[in-house]
Curated annotation (Swiss-Prot):
Its main location: membrane. InterPro entries: AcrB_DN_DC_subdom, Acrflvin-R, Multidrug-R_MdtC. The gene is mdtC. Disulfide bonds: none annotated. Belongs to the resistance-nodulation-cell division (RND) (TC 2.A.6) family. MdtC subfamily. Part of a tripartite efflux system composed of MdtA, MdtB and MdtC. MdtC forms a heteromultimer with MdtB. GO terms for cellular component: plasma membrane. It comes from Citrobacter koseri (strain ATCC BAA-895 / CDC 4225-83 / SGSC4696). It holds the Pfam family ACR_tran. GO terms for molecular function: xenobiotic transmembrane transporter activity. This is Multidrug resistance protein MdtC. Gene3D superfamilies: Multidrug efflux transporter AcrB pore domain, Multidrug efflux transporter AcrB pore domain like, Multidrug efflux transporter AcrB TolC docking domain, DN and DC subdomains, Multidrug efflux transporter AcrB transmembrane domain. The keyword rRNA-binding does not apply. It is a multi-pass membrane protein.
Length: 1028
């Protein structure tokens, strides 16, 4: 009593405390960062290594395996995958959530150093690492185009000037430059001219290497001066290399230009990048795992004017893709939804109270509670994101509940003629415990979420804490500010029955009278109600088992990614044509705003595309509908496939797959994996629950297998090293020298000119100079035959691995897809040597599925414990929790009605319903117990009276929660796919629970009371009957 009086009789202090809470919230709001979702990125580090010309199998065995053995010893590595292709290896390390990315990077560098002695000596550079996830979609893509600059010059400018500057911006993890390669002097050899002059390819390589040497020459000193010695020992351009003497034939000088075409070109001619229909260089910017996407993008945009000053007028720099506009639009939508929810909740309160002055009291509690929450969010390191703002939207219906309960009870005393301050004090004292019980039991629902680990726990933590803080502030406001305002603003009035004669008041009176009549009938047919209650429990179980499930709602971010997978024997020229064809098909779609793409590098038969869709206001289709439409047109392109997927704010794992979900096959027997992977992929592709099924196992590339005749080689004076060096010199784009420039270093690249490698007959033109100085054709000591070879070799851990990626057809849930895959694997009878498991997002979904029921039961158990402590009873918490089955049925039926799968967002809704619907029972049980104790009423009379007296606040609080969630259901625009499942779940659960719990709760109350009475009699303790 003294606690409440302290605030009621000191209005100035109470108001100032509320203002202080509000001001702290305003300050916190201005300081909070903005993000699409809570920070849930796994710490990921990518290790890269190269050995030009090495086959994928060589890269896997000699480079990937030693590194994997060393990296695998690092603490906190949750998953390690690698992919080795022609001349390159990429290892992806995913760490546990609690692993610091900077500490992990130091351990990675130490592991690379430890493995250095086991790596091949011919590697041009040490392995490097980056703190970025290559499977993440870029947060921004910049393009460079020019009508006068070559692609190599643009690439050089982008990598040496722009990429270096952008990489230094806070939050940027990686800047990947694509579309070409660094400038280089290319030496295209003429094998016939070399044969005629008697010059071997090794002679050419040695001559070029020896002619371009950068060594210190020292200095000369005399008594008064010092001169540095400098020579023209470096050659920098193709023009300078052409007259280079590489050999003497019968006294005549043989110059490089006589046997080769020397050009200023690029290191790797098998690269191409495009934006819309124009050749371009792409700068693909990815953020650090712990960075905020909006802050990082804003920092890049702030830097762009400075970058523009570095760019010549003949180069056009454009932002081809920026993920932040849709994120900002989504947050604006949810902020508007929050405002609408607040307005609807206040409107509900006004309809019930029919007084502007009375409505103002709970209306003040809403902004104070919501705004004050921002301060706690800032202190906890949270952000303004879709989930935290949805928590505040839902909180509008909660934070007003406590004020409504207090206000309604004080109003009842005022109508009985009590003075305002006395009514405020008495009314608050009567319902103080009720309000405390409702708030603490609601917060208790979220305790299991706070203790939940992994990605789901990280994702839901901000939601749970934000909502809990809002409820806590609401509890404080409803027990301090609300009674103070009631005591000083409201006046004694006539009973409601005399003032409510029309409109909504008459409707509410009629409902209350009808409820009283129907409740009498129900209390006389309790067995039927018991059957209904048991039926809802069974229906809950059946609906949960049968409803389609997914991990997270599919988002429409307005950005698509596409992976091109062509025939494994396709040439680069043909692949570049496929890229152009695919880009034209996509560019012609009316929903597409911009498209960029690139191909080439170590995997000639693959490419990537990034597609920006028009804003939601400019297109009538969702991203998935655009993909479905494009899939039909893209399927008509022969010889290659383009797999499209909508970019999501949550992507788990480091695999660069061509679809949203993955199923990984592992085996210690590579031959078994290669035998069974095509069978499994074919079986999965036939499933109607899957779409765009593809695999990263590519072991049917065209290969020309050379077989040496070692006896002939020995007789001719040729060793294997010389033969292998010949092939590397001829076909490996061998980097044979380095050109040092002030801004960068460039390579001299040697290979047989492409004019002489149009078919396999090029091998017949190759020769080796033996130990006697004679030119021996390759065909003299080797024969060749076509064969199949892998284009890539993949590992997970230290096992051979293959990843089958898939998308979901429209209308199919992830649970249906995973169940279909498990059935298919069982039917195929895959041997134990090949192990299959879901990876990435699908793996997290499986883990979440296994813990959902446990999480719900833990929440219920926590609420029971809290209520049991508050009521000092084992029985009354069960009465209150009996409201939950009807809410679960309503939520699951609503999801089925709207064809929405049960996702992590819907799980949040279920958890919220556990806290919401029990409020009705708490208000009934509290008043029934009070009536039994102080009114000398029978249990039947007490619960009946409690139901009638609390009907009005129950209706008010339920409608406030329902209208607070309703905007989530009907909202459209960006991000609506995240908001709607939450709103659907809550609205469905509230409607069903309101219809049933008004009748089931009193029946359950009487059942447990009779059970308690019978138990007390059996134990000869009749005195305990009257105890609460």
């Amino acid at each position: 009593m003294k606690f409440f009086a302290l605030f009621i009789y000191r209005p100035v202090a109470t108001i100032l405390i509320s203002i202080a809470i509000t001001l702290c919230g305003v300050l916190g709001f201005r300081l909070l960062p903005v993000a699409p979702l809570p920070q849930v990125d796994f710490p990921v580090i990518m290790v890269s290594a190269s050995l030009p010309g090495a086959s994928p199998e060589t890269m896997a065995s000699s480079v990937a395996t030693p590194l994997e053995r060393s990296l695998g010893r690092i603490a906190g590595v949750s998953e390690m995958t690698s992919s080795s292709s022609l001349g390159s290896t990429r290892i992806i390390l995913q760490f546990n959530f609690d692993r610091d990315i900077n500490g992990a990077a130091r351990d990675v560098q130490a592991a690379i150093n430890a493995a250095q002695s086991l790596l091949p000596s011919g590697m041009p550079s040490r392995p490097t690492y980056r703190k970025a996830n290559p499977s993440d979609a870029p947060i921004m893509i910049l393009t460079l185009t020019s009508d006068t600059w070559s692609q190599g010059e643009l690439y050089d400018f982008a990598s040496t000037q722009l990429a270096q500057t952008i990489a230094q911006i806070d939050g940027v993890g990686d800047v990947d430059v694509g579309g070409s390669s660094l400038p280089a002097v290319r030496v295209g050899l003429n094998p016939q001219a070399l044969f005629n002059q008697g010059v071997s390819l090794d002679d050419v390589r040695s001559a070029i290497s020896n002619a371009n040497v950068r060594k210190p020459q020292g200095a000369i000193d005399d008594k008064t001066h010092r001169w540095q010695v400098q020579t023209n020992d470096e050659l920098k351009t193709a023009t300078e290399y052409q007259p280079l003497i590489i050999h003497y034939n019968n006294g005549a000088a043989v110059r490089l230009g006589d046997v080769a075409t020397v050009t200023d070109s690029v290191q790797d001619v098998r690269n191409a990048g495009m934006t819309n229909a124009k050749p371009a260089i792409l700068l693909m910017i990815r953020k650090l795992p712990e960075a905020n996407i909006i802050q990082t993008v804003d920092s890049i945009r702030e830097k762009l004017p400075e970058l523009q000053t570095l760019i010549p007028a003949s180069i056009d720099l454009q932002i081809a893709q920026d993920r932040s506009p849709t994120i900002r639009a989504s947050l604006e939508e949810v902020e508007q939804t929050l405002v609408i929810s607040v307005a609807l909740v206040i409107l509900v309160v006004f309809l019930f109270l029919r007084s502007g002055r009375a409505t103002l009291i709970p209306a003040v509690a809403v902004p104070v509670s919501l705004i004050g929450t921002f301060a706690a969010m800032y202190l906890c390191g949270f952000s303004l994101n879709n989930l935290s703002l949805m928590a505040l939207t839902i909180a509008t219906g909660f934070v007003v509940d406590d004020a409504i309960v207090v206000l309604e009870n004080i109003s009842r005393h005022l109508e009985a003629g009590m003075k305002p301050l006395q009514a405020a004090l008495q009314g608050t004292r009567e319902v103080g415990f009720t309000v405390l019980s409702m708030s603490l039991s609601l917060v208790a629902v979220f305790l299991p979420l706070l203790l939940m680990g992994g990605l789901p726990g990280r994702l839901l933590r901000e939601f749970a804490v934000t909502l809990s803080v809002a409820i806590g502030i609401s509890l404080l406001v409803s027990l301090t500010l609300t009674p103070m305002m009631c005591g000083w603003m409201l006046k004694s009035s006539k009973p409601r029955e005399q003032t409510r004669s029309r409109g909504f008041g008459r409707l509410l009176t009629g409902l209350q009278q009808g409820y009283g009549t129907s409740l009498k009938w129900v209390l006389n047919h309790t067995r039927l109600v018991g059957v209904v209650l048991l039926g809802t429990i069974a229906l809950n179980i059946w609906l949960y088992i049968s409803i389609p499930k997914t991990f997270f709602p599919e988002q429409d971010t307005g950005v698509l990614m596409g992976g091109i997978q062509a025939d494994q024997s396709i040439s680069f020229q043909a692949m570049r044509g496929k890229l152009q064809d695919f880009m034209k098909i996509i560019r012609d779609d009316p929903a597409v705003d911009n498209v960029t793409g690139f191909t080439g590098g170590s995997r000639v038969n693959s490419g990537m595309m990034f597609i920006t869709l028009k804003s939601r206001g400019e297109r009538h289709e969702t991203a998935q509908q655009v993909i479905d439409r494009l899939r039909v047109a893209l399927a008509k392109e022969p010889g290659a496939n383009l797999f499209l997927m909508a970019v999501q704010d949550i992507r788990v794992g480091g695999r660069q797959a061509n679809a949203s979900y993955q199923y990984a096959l592992l085996s210690d027997d590579l031959s078994a994996l290669r035998e069974w992977e095509p069978k499994i992929r074919k079986a999965l592709a036939a499933l109607p629950q899957l779409a765009d099924v593809n695999s990263d196992q590519q072991d049917n590339g065209a290969e020309m297998n050379l077989i040496y005749d070692r006896e002939t080689m020995s007789r001719l004076g040729i060793d294997v090293q010389a033969a292998n060096s010949l092939l590397n010199n001829a076909f490996g784009q061998r980097q044979i020298s380095t050109i040092y420039q002030p801004m960068n270093q460039y390579k001299v690249v040697m290979e047989v000119d492409s004019r002489y490698t149009q078919d396999i007959s090029a091998l017949e033109k190759m020769f080796v100079i033996n130990s006697d100085g004679k030119a021996i054709p390759l065909s003299y000591f080797a024969k060749w035959q076509p064969a199949n070879a892998p284009l890539s070799v993949n590992h997970q851990g230290l096992s051979a691995a293959s990843t089958i990626a898939f998308n979901l057809p429209t209308g199919t849930s992830l649970s249906e897809a995973t169940e279909a895959i498990n059935r298919a694997m069982t039917q195929l009878g895959v041997p134990s040597t090949v192990r299959g498991s879901f990876a990435g997002t699908a793996q997290v979904f499986q883990e979440t599925m296994n813990s959902q029921v446990i999480l719900i039961l833990a929440a219920i158990a926590t609420v029971y414990i809290v209520l049991g402590i508050l009521y000092e009873s084992y029985v009354h918490p069960l009465t209150i929790l009996s409201t939950l089955p009807s809410a679960g049925v309503g939520a699951l039926l609503a999801l089925e009605l709207f064809n929405a799968p049960f996702s992590l967002i819907a799980l949040i809704g279920i958890m919220l319903l556990i806290g919401i619907v029990k409020k009705n029972a708490i208000m009934m049980v509290d008043f029934a117990l009070e009536a039994q104790r102080n009114g000398n009423l029978t249990p039947e009379q007490a619960i009946f009276q409690a139901c009638l007296l609390r009907f009005r606040p129950i209706m008010m609080t339920t409608l406030a929660a329902l209208f607070g969630a309703l905007p989530l259901v009907i909202s459209g625009g960006d991000g609506s796919e995240l908001r709607q499942p939450l709103g659907i779940t809550i609205v469905g659960g509230l409607v069903m629970s309101q219809l049933l719990t008004l009748y089931t709760t009193p029946v359950v109350y009487l059942f447990f009371d009779r059970l308690r009475l019978r138990f007390s009699r059996n134990n000869s303790q009749p005195e305990s009957i009257t105890e609460p």
